[in-house]
UniProtKB/Swiss-Prot annotation:
Protein name as it appears in the record: DNA-directed RNA polymerase subunit beta
Gene Ontology MF terms: DNA binding; DNA-directed RNA polymerase activity; ribonucleoside binding
Native species: Corynebacterium efficiens (strain DSM 44549 / YS-314 / AJ 12310 / JCM 11189 / NBRC 100395)
The reaction(s) this protein catalyses: RNA(n) + a ribonucleoside 5'-triphosphate = RNA(n+1) + diphosphate
Family the UniProt entry places it in: Belongs to the RNA polymerase beta chain family.
Primary gene name: rpoB
Amino acid sequence: MIHPREVLEGPILAVSRQTKSVVDIPGAPKRYSFAKVSAPIEVPGLLDLQLDSFAWLIGTPEWRARQQEEFGEGARITSGLENILEELSPIQDYSGNMSLSLSEPRFEPVKNTIDEAKEKDINYAAPLYVTAEFVNNTTGEIKSQTVFIGDFPMMTDKGTFIINGTERVVVSQLVRSPGVYFDQTIDKSTERPLHAVKVIPSRGAWLEFDVDKRDSVGVRIDRKRRQPVTVLLKALGWTTEQITERFGFSEIMMSTLESDGVANTDEALLEIYRKQRPGEQPTRDLAQSLLDNSFFKAKRYDLAKVGRYKINRKLGLGGDNDGLMTLTEEDIATAIEYLVRLHAGERVMTSPTGEEIPVETDDIDHFGNRRLRTVGELIQNQVRVGLSRMERVVRERMTTQDAESITPTSLINVRPVSAAIREFFGTSQLSQFMDQNNSLSGLTHKRRLSALGPGGLSRERAGIEVRDVHPSHYGRMCPIETPEGPNIGLIGSLASYARVNPFGFIETPYRRVIDGKLTDQIDYLTADEEDRFVVAQANTHYDEDGVITDESVTVRLKDGDIAMVSRTDVDYMDVSPRQMVSVGTAMIPFLEHDDANRALMGANMQKQAVPLVRAEAPFVGTGMELRAAYDAGDLVITPKAGVVENVTADIVTIMDDEGKRDTYVLRKFQRTNQGTSYNQKPLVNQGDRVEAGQVIADGPGTFNGEMSLGRNLLVAFMPWEGHNYEDAIILNQNIVEQDILTSIHIEEHEIDARDTKLGAEEITRDIPNVSEEVLKDLDERGIVRIGADVRDGDILVGKVTPKGETELTPEERLLRAIFGEKAREVRDTSMKVPHGETGKVIGVRRFSREDDDDLAPGVNEMIRVYVAQKRKIQDGDKLAGRHGNKGVVGKILPQEDMPFLPDGTPVDIILNTHGVPRRMNIGQVLETHLGWLAAAGWSVDPEDPKNAELIKTLPKELYDVPAGSLTATPVFDGASNEELAGLLANSRPNRDGDVMVNADGKATLIDGRSGEPYPYPVSIGYMYMLKLHHLVDEKIHARSTGPYSMITQQPLGGKAQFGGQRFGEMEVWAMQAYGAAYTLQELLTIKSDDVVGRVKVYEAIVKGENIPDPGIPESFKVLLKELQSLCLNVEVLSADGTPMELAGDDDDFDQAGASLGINLSRDERSDADTA
């Protein structure tokens, strides 16, 4: 076996480093855990995927120190940027007399802080410089200069980039690895297996060999026409004797050799050239250089380190040619030999190095054949594109400029490089607007793996196989967390313990087992390596010495097969039961009892939870909450121990043990990308002692340093008067009044004052035709004051724009002369609160050219207003649990009408029982039981005979748990049904000495309206409920008048366009079914697009007359025009058969409108933006 470490030279990607263990986090809240398996290692740093990859790209000092430590002092270590500069250098002119080399990339300090970059809409970037050395080979002259390449976006410590003021994430891409792939297809006519092999480089032409149904071996170069494979071998200089000597064992190769029709190398080269470049006149030299450039020249062909590693492993070529990034004749010959042996049905072959290698086809969906392009490599590829564009410019300038006066700076044009970087961050499919809905959504976004994007798959072409869960995903990519919809299976999430190796393959850790005994050795294995071992699961029983106690053990073999083997045959064991799932999925308690489809929804909906005004940690957790919040980067963590000196709402000052004062500024009520509120709250008090690594302030959606996205609510499973039919939810009014599910949402409104052709726009309080009442909240500049309560239509910023000058009347000229400029024509273009929005102004930012702010060309002033809205839970809002159990609030009942327990406690929420059985997410019921136990507490007497079975599995620290405790039931290693049943029988009584919930988890509930008990006991307990981002306030919409489409003259559609409701085909059928002909005619004409009719109706209503008859709808006229455009002569005939002219009513329309002084047919251009 070739170990990945042995073939490493040049680009070295960092391996994930161990981060702080959960048990080491000082001040962490106490959770009572039901875990039976203790993991030998902690979860690696959850952001290492991003941070380490970027550290490799720019070569940070910390990264270099880690590499020196791992590979020894003498090892040659190059960063990603150094690699591409080495690849590119030297750039020579066409004659070879001059060359330019680039080296030593280095960064100056970042220009702006992260907050400044966000505020000013600029990039968080550092200037990049390289050393450029120009050599004139004829004179021997060397000129060296430092060249500025451009501002290079830098990653923040949270793994994000700030581009144009917004936070973005670069998602890692899953692509097929370069290498050699053998494939089998069945011929439809003969039903015989046909075999093919593809040699796929990182960059360059594909080389494909295949055996067709006539048993001839062919080759395709760069997807061009097929030709006999012996033609290629002869073109490489092989004689017939050499071919016979190497492939004489194969009849199909010999028959191909006899029928190839070329006698020698020259003929073979010309034949290849004709196939590759049909229509061009071939010469031997041209043909030879075409073949050399295609596969044997590093400029045109690059296998990359990973491609060379994969080819050597597959074909058993040893490690002698590790540094070679092009193909060799031996690669080609061995690939052909492997193919013909595979076709002959052989199972093993001897490689050129004498190694016995298996002969088998490859599974392209196997994670041994798919690798990750992480952020560093994606940016590196983009810089390479920019530098290759720059290289062309440098070559041209070398030939055109005077050799004596050339300097490196005169040759280099850095525009292509900075443009390529800007294009990648701004427009690439893999550079995404960060999901900041809550802490978990940001964390999982950074750990996302996408098979889409440039060089990847497209969602239209991707089949079922590539989307499906594969055995090699185990411990590498989560089988649960993926989007629903067209991207299912193409976008995944990194498993919790996984890391990326230097080649981009995902590795997962296993614990070494030798002769049935566990060792402390942890090996990270790729999917390829894992296939050769026998792996037991994490919950395999072993004694205190680590010896496996079961004689036969359930294990996983190659291709995911499950078998029972002797304990001495086990090679490895999983490190943790949650090894196969992602961070988001690992936060679903009792995941093992949920159907995978519902678990997928649960994992995805946690990312949609909005942070609440008051967070609350879940009674039932999984133990992952602390670590997820800690690594997400939204908590404030002190790096040094000390004493808290001062605490306010937004500043914490700590005097550390060295006598140095550290000040931490908290972020208060800032807007996130999704419009939720980002707010940090201090957790420490003045005089507290804090340790290094302690959480001193909570972020959004965290509580005491734990991820806390929802609230614990007392839930009853029962139907209630049909109000919770079809997943509707009934809530207690108390939840609204106590602000239990209240969230804060912040909207940003922006307006700028520009120079127009008619003069400059002005931000002012002096707005024409507006009463003082409307201006009451504006300051003297015309900007709304902070703290003002605003609702839709209120002015936030007053602005006037010059109107077009018209011919002035004598009276206006007189006014102009008396009052000066004041009487000039301006129109009100103030920024108003959009339709349907209300809130309180919490911030105003003003940027002005006078203050030297960097504004876009033509903009003199820009104002941003932040409006915060407190949204209480209401009918129509969406709530969900963590098990995919989602629903919409259907009714909010007064507290006195809710069912209540015998001690008078009303339930918070009523869920329908029908939501459980067919969805098979039983985890929600178990969570409810354990939630009740955590809230009530329990006490187990180990001496009591009824607890004999319970104490066999229950950890000793769980015998006595107080009320209101937090519990952890890790996925696949949590509380069992028997434990829950046993604990329910031992739950603590309430203060009156009564036990409310029986041993079966049910209670007698009393109807709040009648005071009568319900006839059957009801399942009751605490469930953790999330309020999702799908809020009814953002969806509800109504329109009276508004913009029309210019073509059809019908109202626009959708809330964003302030559109109307579509009365569609099916609605028309309903009207027809009821025979409501006149109502239907009205809907399709005067209420929609009968332009003349709708004005006349308005006129009739104003004048108190009868409604006139409808005319012809505009959409009918459009239909006629479309038919005429297809050269069909369409006429409208009257009842007596005479042709009618449709376009004659406009005069009536104009007169009616003019007489009323209105124009109802406003088009979308003028109105859609103001609506």
